């Protein structure tokens, strides 16, 4: 039987490239079957993992974008509040500075007025005492001159 098969195979002409026998469709079906098995067992799970990962990345990116926008809005609000607070603080400082300067000027004016008044009273008092002293001195001078005159006129007494 082996001889017959060998004779049959050796007597048959090969068709070369265009020799189609049952092996070509069998190999093609095996290839397709392997591709189907690989697709089901490896590629679909890997594709699912890749899609899940892509969705996760997109969600995370979207969440990060929203957080970034909220952060920018919050930062802008805080900057406005800080700027407003700085303006209010500066206005308060200016107001207090103006009030303090006004108070200092008023105190200075009051002090100058009281000093002038004190000096004026002191000068008036000094003039009054001067006049009084001059009167007393004049009276004493008159008395003394009267005594001298009397002694000169009446040397015996």
UniProtKB/Swiss-Prot annotation:
<comment type="similarity">
    <text>Belongs to the ATPase B chain family.</text>
</comment>
<keyword id="KW-0150">Chloroplast</keyword>
<keyword id="KW-0547">Nucleotide-binding</keyword>
<dbReference type="GO" id="GO:0046961">
    <property type="term" value="F:proton-transporting ATPase activity, rotational mechanism"/>
</dbReference>
<feature type="transmembrane region" description="Helical">
    <location>
        <begin position="26"/>
        <end position="43"/>
    </location>
</feature>
<keyword id="KW-0812">Transmembrane</keyword>
<comment type="function">
    <text>Component of the F(0) channel, it forms part of the peripheral stalk, linking F(1) to F(0). The b'-subunit is a diverged and duplicated form of b found in plants and photosynthetic bacteria.</text>
</comment>
<dbReference type="GO" id="GO:0046933">
    <property type="term" value="F:proton-transporting ATP synthase activity, rotational mechanism"/>
</dbReference>
<keyword id="KW-1133">Transmembrane helix</keyword>
<dbReference type="GO" id="GO:0045259">
    <property type="term" value="C:proton-transporting ATP synthase complex"/>
</dbReference>
<dbReference type="InterPro" id="IPR050059">
    <property type="entry name" value="ATP_synthase_B_chain"/>
</dbReference>
<keyword id="KW-0934">Plastid</keyword>
<keyword id="KW-0066">ATP synthesis</keyword>
<dbReference type="GO" id="GO:0005524">
    <property type="term" value="F:ATP binding"/>
</dbReference>
<dbReference type="InterPro" id="IPR034679">
    <property type="entry name" value="ATP_synth_b"/>
</dbReference>
<dbReference type="GO" id="GO:0009535">
    <property type="term" value="C:chloroplast thylakoid membrane"/>
</dbReference>
<keyword id="KW-0793">Thylakoid</keyword>
<keyword id="KW-0406">Ion transport</keyword>
<comment type="subunit">
    <text>F-type ATPases have 2 components, F(1) - the catalytic core - and F(0) - the membrane proton channel. F(1) has five subunits: alpha(3), beta(3), gamma(1), delta(1), epsilon(1). F(0) has four main subunits: a(1), b(1), b'(1) and c(10-14). The alpha and beta chains form an alternating ring which encloses part of the gamma chain. F(1) is attached to F(0) by a central stalk formed by the gamma and epsilon chains, while a peripheral stalk is formed by the delta, b and b' chains.</text>
</comment>
<dbReference type="Pfam" id="PF00430">
    <property type="entry name" value="ATP-synt_B"/>
</dbReference>
<keyword id="KW-0138">CF(0)</keyword>
<keyword id="KW-0375">Hydrogen ion transport</keyword>
<protein>
    <recommendedName>
        <fullName>ATP synthase subunit b', chloroplastic</fullName>
    </recommendedName>
</protein>
<keyword id="KW-0813">Transport</keyword>
<keyword id="KW-0067">ATP-binding</keyword>
<dbReference type="InterPro" id="IPR002146">
    <property type="entry name" value="ATP_synth_b/b'su_bac/chlpt"/>
</dbReference>
<keyword id="KW-0472">Membrane</keyword>
<comment type="function">
    <text>F(1)F(0) ATP synthase produces ATP from ADP in the presence of a proton or sodium gradient. F-type ATPases consist of two structural domains, F(1) containing the extramembraneous catalytic core and F(0) containing the membrane proton channel, linked together by a central stalk and a peripheral stalk. During catalysis, ATP synthesis in the catalytic domain of F(1) is coupled via a rotary mechanism of the central stalk subunits to proton translocation.</text>
</comment>
